[in-house]
């Protein structure tokens, strides 16, 4: 309850145009409350910018896909010719094939075209990294 009261107060101050400096290790709070961020690790600023811009910078062009198909082999042949594919696990109401597909420099519509020719798409979501994922990746890559 106290965390919600604080969160509501921060959001109210933000709505009034106040600048709030927020220091936390809880990255889910950062995503919920902040517009601009600076990720600091061991006194080094690793990333700075608007949350959306930071996430765009770290996007991987990966999609979580669910598809109902009568021809799994044909579908897999078609998509592996153009894209990198791995199994996915997500909740679904269907007994669909679940895949993670990395499209590289291709447009999402190219993937959708291949999928819709081979079955009924039941799930299509871009996998956007969380701020926590970005922080871990950045710290690991910089070995700081």
Where would I find each of the regions flagged by the language model?
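ABC transporter nucleotide-binding domain
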Residues: 9-102
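Short alpha-helix in the ABC/ABC-like ATPase nucleotide-binding domain
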Residues: 2-5, 9
């Amino acid at each position: 309850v106290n965390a919600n009261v604080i969160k509501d107060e921060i959001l109210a101050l933000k709505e009034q145009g106040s600048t709030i400096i927020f220091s936390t290790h809880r990255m889910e709070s950062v995503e919920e409350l902040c517009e601009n961020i600076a990720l600091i690790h061991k006194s080094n600023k690793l990333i700075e910018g608007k949350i959306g811009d930071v996430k765009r910078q770290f996007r991987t062009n990966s999609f979580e896909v669910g598809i109902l198909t009568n021809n799994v082999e044909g579908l897999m042949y078609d998509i592996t010719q153009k894209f990198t594919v791995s199994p996915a696990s997500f909740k679904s109401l269907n007994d669909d094939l679940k895949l993670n597909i990395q499209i590289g420099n291709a447009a999402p519509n190219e993937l959708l075209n291949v999928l819709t020719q081979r079955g009924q798409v039941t799930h299509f979501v871009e996998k956007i990294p969380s701020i926590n994922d970005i922080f871990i990746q950045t710290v690991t890559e910089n070995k700081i």
